[in-house]
Amino acid sequence: ADFCCHNKDRDAEAEIVADYVNSNVDYVFGGGAKLFENREDGRDLFKELRDKGFQTPRSWDELVKIKSGKVFAVPYPVDAPLPDERGDLLARASLKGIELLSQNDNGFFMMIEGSQLDDYGHFNDINLLMQETHDFDRTIGAIYEWAAKDGETLVVVTADHETGGLTLVDGDLKEGKIVCKFSTGGHSGVMV
């Protein structure tokens, strides 16, 4: 939403998602379907998106059948399933976006987010943080492979901050063991 929706209050989710209807975005994949329908204001944002020329698949199976055009795929009521439950969904959804966006002769810009990395840092949940990190790493690997074959694509990976103050305090390479501790439930000054 950062690149096409604007609001002074990051928690004003219902207002933020309404901005998608008038955005120039060509491909969206993610969670939050409950914010698009059965709204307090009576709007059906999926219908409004379709009226603006978007296809709005509500499942992965519907999405894979789409071969061109603008796509707004929000198949999950809230967040996507947990990393261990969703498999390589982030990589597949990202590559599907590239398949559609690369049809534009003028090129494309795409932002892919490991959206739960921040949450799991706030929760100090090392298990879910590692799952999400591995998922994001595999996704970036798939994108780099595509970009290498394409030969004309710049891939930039960045972060805005670290969350949780995760510190490695011990470990053993031979045993494949690490011991880590969180120092905060908030953001830290750790370099990313």
Model-derived regions: residue spans:
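A post-motif C-terminal structural segment
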Residues: 4-192
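Mobile, glycine-rich extracellular loop/lid and propeptide segments
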Residues: 1
